[in-house]
Swiss-Prot record:
The lineage of its organism: Bacteria, Bacillati, Bacillota, Bacilli, Bacillales. It comes from Anoxybacillus flavithermus (strain DSM 21510 / WK1). This is Sulfite reductase [NADPH] hemoprotein beta-component. InterPro entries: CysI, NiRdtase/SiRdtase_haem-b_fer, Nit/Sulf_reduc_fer-like_dom_sf, NO2/SO3_Rdtase_4Fe4S_dom, NO2/SO3_Rdtase_4Fe4S_prot, NO2/SO3_Rdtase_4Fe4S_sf, NO2/SO3_Rdtase_FeS/sirohaem_BS. The keyword Iron-sulfur applies. PROSITE patterns: NIR_SIR. GO terms for cellular component: sulfite reductase complex (NADPH). [4Fe-4S] cluster binds at C436, C442, C481, C485. Pathway: Sulfur metabolism; hydrogen sulfide biosynthesis; hydrogen sulfide from sulfite (NADPH route): step 1/1. Pfam families: NIR_SIR (PF01077), NIR_SIR_ferr (PF03460). Belongs to the nitrite and sulfite reductase 4Fe-4S domain family.
Amino acid sequence: MEKFLLTAPDGPPSDVERIKQESNYLRGTLKETMEDRITAGIPEDDNRLMKFHGSYLQDDRDLRAERQKQKLEPAYQFMIRVRTPGGVATPEQWLAMDELARKYANGTLKLTTRQAFQFHGVLKWNMKKTLQAINDALLTTLAACGDVNRNVMCNPNPYQSEVHAEVYEWAKRLSDHLLPQTRAYYEIWLDEEKVADTPDVEQEPIYGALYLPRKFKIGIAVPPSNDVDVFSQDLGFIAIVEHGKLAGFNVAIGGGMGMTHGDRTTYPQLAKVIGFCKPEQVIDVAEKVVTIQRDYGNRSVRKHARFKYTIDRLGLDAIKAELERRLGWELEEARPYRFEHNGDRYGWVEGVNGTWHFTLFIEGGRVKDTDDYPLMTGLREIAKVHTGDFRLTANQNLVIANVPSEKKEEMDALIQQYKLTDGKHYSALRRNSLACVALPTCGLAMAEAERYLPTLIDKIEEIVEENGLRDEEITIRMTGCPNGCARHVLGEIAFIGKSVGKYNMYLGAAFDGSRLGKLYRENIGEKEILSELRMLLSRYAKERFDGERFGDFVIRAGIVKEVTDGTNFHD
């Protein structure tokens, strides 16, 4: 085996590294800070640590100017993210999340692009009660954010239930294995008695006292569906099914969507397949990959700290060699697989063992009641009688899963009663849309996303109808900033917020999530967006080959250049 010399980059540690170093395994002064009733906010050092506990301090940006005028502090509130490996939740857990959303949050539930629940608008004084109730529901927020392994994604594919069940178990085991071991979470939120420190005991055998240089994301896909966007993950596992059984996983490393506007040294990148492992080797592979990033990731410049930059700096071959050295065995050659799409399949689908699954379209992943659409109430009533489970999808939708044949009629009646929709009366474009939260709660947002994309799609749908493309599946994604929470540049049409009402527009991503999009127009508003799409969709309708996807067409037609690797994304 070729020998490589790996080194971590030079440079002083970032301020976040100092905060972690001084935190005593994520404790900091959080306990005292949360008991302080003078302010609804918390100091920045504690806010950095709060992420590891699954929460961010935010403020309502719609109210910011008015509160400044009144000489009031910002309308501080917390976002709480709940870890649900593989997006699977029991009906009892759904009911608990529903109750907490109405009792302590803003009355809505957000289903995220990583198959987790999010609460918005939780006040500081309600944080402890909320986290204790989440714990009582046998869920946790620990490591839902922060420089650790985040929620492990897993394909909730209702077509392959037997394989899904097995793959889900591996997702859950991965999640459990990579959870931080510190007791800080339990002491601060769950009133666990602090055990006297014993210096000879390693509190974090995998992470160490400094945890990882940056967030780390893992996802498992089951072909032909790439709904988890496996190539966007730091570590992706592609399930290989042979003769109806799970043979193992192809291993892909080094994906990540985030970048910084105007900084060409930052870029999105897709994970690359480096080999195959058996199911029982998955935990070992994941742990060793995480420790490589722990040891060689950039702890000086956070915007260069993701695993993708570690790989591009040191070389894929060097990282693979180091992985195999740490494993003590070599990965097998990658096995053939084929992805066909990265969207959801809506409505009723028959599974195995006489069970059924209903995939519900939830625009923007926002579960709430409106005057004409009692979505939250309907799901609450379904959860009261449902004997299967709920599966949050990576596209912010929901599968009412494992409905026994004898209960399908009852479930269907509830779906009809509350007008719950599979989205089939919407355009295929809308059904394949994805948006991050953005304004008013996200502190990083430069423009609207979740609140604006449905309105923009209303106008794009007119163009789609004019060109006979209503049932043509095209993925469209919007984020309020370039960080990539909605995996923006994997949308065939993508918008990244630049300033209020202005977006960078990207085209040319692959429908199956295997190619990044390319910058097409910079800093444009709605009028220009619609003008460009009128021309593009008209050309697509007239000039496309039979079965040709929109993302493939714009490259063949010379409208944008193909992105072959993240390192030439800006070329």
